[in-house]
């Protein structure tokens, strides 16, 4: 068997394979003999029909089946020999073979996993946040929490500002046609302190109660509402109510004092531990995100189209399921995301992680997997039941194994990169806008 490979920069390669005619002829004859054994044709005893007649009657079907089998057989022999890892299904193309005396020629187009080397890890510089938590910081945090729990809102007759609580009705139109199923009444939220599209927040500012406002947006083609995907939709909003938060210093002071006194006697240490755990998680994610973002920049990869399609479909199905289960609002910002771009980033990270695991022979530590499961179980009322579920369910355990592997990869990278420590206060870390730091390592 002879083959010729044509390389393509975009992960789609083409191989041309020559199968000796003798192999094809022998396979055809063998197939015709098998058919003859099982077939009875008028005028001939079973198994005694001349091969030429069998060939005339069943030839086209047999040629098609035999060529298909041989094309697949020799292609998979080729990728096994060359140690090629393909993505998706290959596409076979037959050549005109009239002039070929010795070979039948065909080509196969196939996608391959991208080949790349992880570069410049030691040149990566990242910032590690260090927070020294003092008792007075914890008390301050408790005071803030106490005041949040007793927010009092009062109706106002003025222009809407950031952080006001508004109540609205809205309906939507496509080409001046009202889409009644999306009507929403008495929809309440705090301006600029929500997860809705910026157009909504921006339009409300400086408007008054009873104002009617309009804005138009183009819905993302990946939005869970199929009826709205890729369409220009006009929103009509009626402002029903505007409220501002009451700042009563005396009331807040009393509430804080009561809260702190109670907490100091009951579970002050628990609250402190929770704050420490939260900060540990925030700073760790911040560190990981910096490393991953720089790895992506320093190691560009051509993402194969098949992988991108599969990952985009996975994210789309996940979004649709979540949207329906939670009965989410069409204005939620996360559903106006370009899933293809998100899928590309996720695949980029996944390929880098897999490469680091392979190159450095990182393997699962079963003891650490068990410890992770135990840690997860402690968040539930019946930890032992949760541990048993993970023991019995191989898919769940595999998920934890992947998390443990990713943690090892991050530890490996943290040792390689240059870390610059930076001290933050508890206030700084609590007031930082962490929403802008997308969790990439997931």
UniProtKB/Swiss-Prot annotation:
Entry EC number(s): 5.2.1.8
Gene Ontology biological-process annotations: cell division; protein folding; protein transport
Enzyme class, UniProt record, top EC level: isomerase
Reactions catalysed according to its record: [protein]-peptidylproline (omega=180) = [protein]-peptidylproline (omega=0)
SUPFAM superfamilies given in the database record: FKBP-like, Triger factor/SurA peptide-binding domain-like, Trigger factor ribosome-binding domain
GO cellular component, one term: cytoplasm
Source taxon at top rank: Bacteria
Keyword match Isomerase: yes
Record's subcellular location: Cytoplasm
InterPro entries in the cross-refs: PPIase_dom_sf (IPR046357), Trig_fac (IPR005215), Trigger_fac_C (IPR008880), Trigger_fac_C_sf (IPR037041), Trigger_fac_ribosome-bd_bac (IPR008881), Trigger_fac_ribosome-bd_sf (IPR036611), Trigger_fact/SurA_dom_sf (IPR027304)
Record-linked NCBIfam families: tig
Protein role: Involved in protein export. Acts as a chaperone by maintaining the newly synthesized protein in an open conformation. Functions as a peptidyl-prolyl cis-trans isomerase.
Protein name, UniProt field: Trigger factor
Protein's organism: Buchnera aphidicola subsp. Schizaphis graminum (strain Sg)
